[in-house]
Amino acid sequence: MASSGVRSVGKNLMKLKFTDKGIIDYRDCLNEMLSLIKTSPEGHEIWYLEHPSVFTVGISEKEIKEDPNSDPPIYKTDRGGKITYHGIGQIVFYFMLNLKQTPFKPSELTKKILASTSVAIEDLGLKNNISESDPGLYVNGEKLASIGMRIKSNYSYHGLSLNHDVNLK
């Protein structure tokens, strides 16, 4: 189910589409993201979804090898960060943003997403802090949210994983 809107920022109008992708395989979702940004969309899209159990390995992790046959599978990806577990009960937000149409520099993207998420989480009564050394949001020393982004041809993709009701044991 998708919803869309137009938001005014200064003199700019930004088209923004939110899409609930439900439960979707990580590789299928990645292919959809890449297909979308290849079309050079004018506006922005934010997808929210869950993945069946999977580990994704970002470009900062050099030791762990891809193993699609392991349980859960391990996939190398081109996002920033190290290794992240995704599973049912974790809400993933993917941000496909046209960075030519944002009021901030591409280098500020990750910090803007984390700051906005931190405020939203705090508004729900959950005191949290942002870590610079291991980017994400922490509550009482436990990681609540991880972030890993990639920018290609002025478009962002990948995003933020928020642990809601996931078994991390």
Where does each model-flagged region fall?
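Compositionally biased, low-complexity intrinsically disordered regions
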Residues: 1-4
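N-terminal lobe of the biotin/lipoate ligase/transferase fold
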Residues: 6-144
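Short, conserved beta-strand/beta-arch hydrophobic-aromatic motifs that form part
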Residues: 59-66, 73, 144-164, 168-169
